[in-house]
Structures are given as C-alpha cells and as structure tokens.
C-alpha cells in the first residue's frame, strides 16, 4: 500500500503470481471507475523495419476479439454509459475504459479482451492500413506535428526515439497479421503489464476480480532489460548540430530547438521539468515575458522537458513572423 501525500488516499499495488501489476485507488467523489491496462511496449521497442507496429496493433484491437465481433466492443461499452479508447506512446500502449461504477467489471473485461484476444483479421488489417496512412499524411500537413517529428529525428538520432510513433508508410504497408501476433507474444505478457483501477470501488473486490480475470494468462518469454541512453553522448560522436528547414504553405514560421537530456528514469528529469516551467511553462514565464511582451519577437513561445523512459529532449518552440526569426534566434542563443 502506497500513501499519496497529495490526496491523503492510499494506492494499493499488488503483483499477481503471473507478474501482472495491479494498482487500485478508491475515490468515492464520483460514481465512476476508470480502468487502464498499460503494456510496457511502444514505438521505442520496435525494430526499424516494423516501425509503427505498436500503433497498428492499437487500431486492430477495435476490429474485434474472439468473443466480441467488430464494433461490438464499443457498442457494449457505450450502451452501458461508458467510454472506450486506446493510445500508443514511445514507451507504452494503454487500453482505456471509463465506466459508471456499477459497470466497472465490464470495463476491466473489455481491456483484458482487447489486449489478449484480438481477432487480427488479414482483410481488416489491409483496410486499416489505409486509415493509418491517411492519419500519417494528415500529420505531414500539420506544422506542429511535422516539426516535432523532425526535431526528435535529429535530436535523438541513433535511438529508437528518432522514429515517429505512427511509423512510415513503407513499414506500415509491409506489416502482416503474423508480425502482429509475434509482437503480441513478445510483449503482451502479464509480467509486462500494469492494470490501474481508480474510482468508486472496493479495492479487495477489484483485486479478486483481477486475479480471476487475468490468472489464465501466462508469460511466454523472459523480458530483455533495456538501459537508458547517455544524454551527454548524443548527438552521436562525430555528428554536428543540425539545422533543418522545411518549407510549407504556412503564413508563420514554426521554430524549435532541442538538446538531448536524461529520461524519466533519472532524478534529473524532475529538475528539468521545473526549469522548463520557469523558462516557458506559461504566460508568466521568463521567455514568454521577454520574447512575447518585452521584445515582441514571437506570437507564442514555450519550453518543455519531453521525457521518455530512456532519454529525453529539452525543447524550446516558438511561432513567429519570418522577419523576426534572425533577431529572435540571436537573442535566444
């Protein structure tokens, strides 16, 4: 049991015999229960030739499971007044339900079903590839998305974080259902998952139900430990600071500068979070007051510590007019 110093509540964390971690937090303020099933595998765990497979799998689980045909999953959740979603990040994939408290078991069962029993129909996969490629192309039309992808590709070059979560059209098109099944077998193991349940629940009842639902699942292979990258060795030896300019049909200039920093596994990450907030976290921050209000060089500016599991990037972004880029950059550097 872990006490939360901010809320005064206690979070109950239990590891089941098969290695599944279960975190339960009772919160009676609302008649709701949020359930999340985290899989410790995202785009940073992919091979270069299968870039985007985590995101493709996230899409495919909505196409049906062994016990719930296509569209039945969302219909079942929504008809009970709930919400269903999923998301892919660099370091994890998460399956999400928010339910009225009387239907919390359904929420847990649905995330279990999606993670462990997706149908993965080949025809559905080919159809969904078109949807994902269209999503990728829309991202290319968005200056912020395009800038962030380019920024990480250069700042974290030589690490798995230099690839976009969504992957590339070539790698997406090449994926097969067998690729997805192999990926599931490698990473979708209880020992590599965290089940989180928060809301108006009895923790003992939730734990008992989790043990019942997830006990049948066994681990299929040992997990390889991954080590953090040394931020002070990036960019890689021999490389030089990069300047990337990408023209586009926009009236403004979207500028970003970044350098590699330690990831979330380092104590320094919290220090960098504070520094980022002081420099450019909101309208009262140093950079915002200096470059937006005093010098009037930018329309907006922000600073963030983009922290991943094994590495991070300290990022300054700004939106400004083209004729103000040079004086802004000179002042910043």
Residue ranges and their predicted role:
Residues 113-122, 212-221, 333:
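A common structural junction motif
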Residues 268-270:
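Zinc-dependent metallopeptidase catalytic helix centered on the HExxH motif
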Residues 1-45, 67-105, 138-192, 216-266, ...:
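Non-catalytic beta-strand/loop surface segments
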Residues 51-65:
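Active-site SXXK
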Residues 107-111, 126:
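Divalent-metal coordination cores built from histidine and acidic residues
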């Amino acid at each position: 049991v872990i006490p939360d110093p901010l809320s005064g509540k206690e979070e109950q964390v239990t590891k089941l015999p098969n290695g599944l971690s279960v975190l339960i937090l009772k919160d009676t303020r609302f008649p709701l229960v949020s359930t999340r099933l985290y899989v410790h595998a995202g785009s940073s765990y992919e091979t270069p030739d299968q870039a985007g497979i985590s995101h493709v799998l996230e899409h495919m689980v909505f196409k049906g499971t062994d016990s719930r045909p296509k569209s039945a999953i969302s219909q079942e959740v929504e008809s009970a007044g709930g919400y269903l979603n999923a998301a892919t990040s660099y370091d994890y994939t998460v399956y999400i339900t928010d339910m009225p408290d009387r239907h919390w078991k359904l929420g847990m069962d649905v995330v279990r079903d999606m993670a462990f029993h997706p149908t993965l129909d080949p025809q559905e996969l080919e159809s969904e590839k078109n949807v994902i490629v269209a999503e990728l192309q829309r991202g290319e039309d968005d200056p912020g998305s395009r800038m962030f992808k380019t920024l990480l590709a250069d700042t974290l070059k030589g690490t798995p974080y230099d690839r976009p979560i969504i992957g590339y059209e070539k790698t997406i098109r090449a994926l097969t259902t067998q690729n997805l099944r192999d990926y599931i077998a490698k990473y979708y193991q209880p020992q590599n998952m965290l089940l989180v349940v928060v809301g108006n629940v009895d923790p003992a009842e939730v734990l008992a139900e989790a043990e019942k639902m997830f006990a049948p699942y066994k681990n299929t292979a040992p997990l390889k430990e991954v080590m953090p990258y040394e931020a002070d060795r990036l960019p890689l030896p021999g490389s030089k600071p990069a300047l990337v300019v990408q023209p586009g049909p926009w009236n403004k200039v979207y500028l970003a500068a970044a350098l590699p920093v330690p990831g979330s596994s380092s104590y320094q990450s919290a220090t960098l979070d504070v520094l980022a907030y002081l420099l450019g976290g909101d309208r009262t921050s140093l950079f915002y007051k200096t470059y937006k209000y005093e010098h009037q060089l930018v329309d907006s500016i922000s600073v963030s510590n983009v922290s991943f599991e094994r590495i991070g990037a300290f990022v300054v972004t700004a939106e400004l007019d083209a004729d103000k880029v040079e004086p802004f950059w000179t002042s910043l550097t």
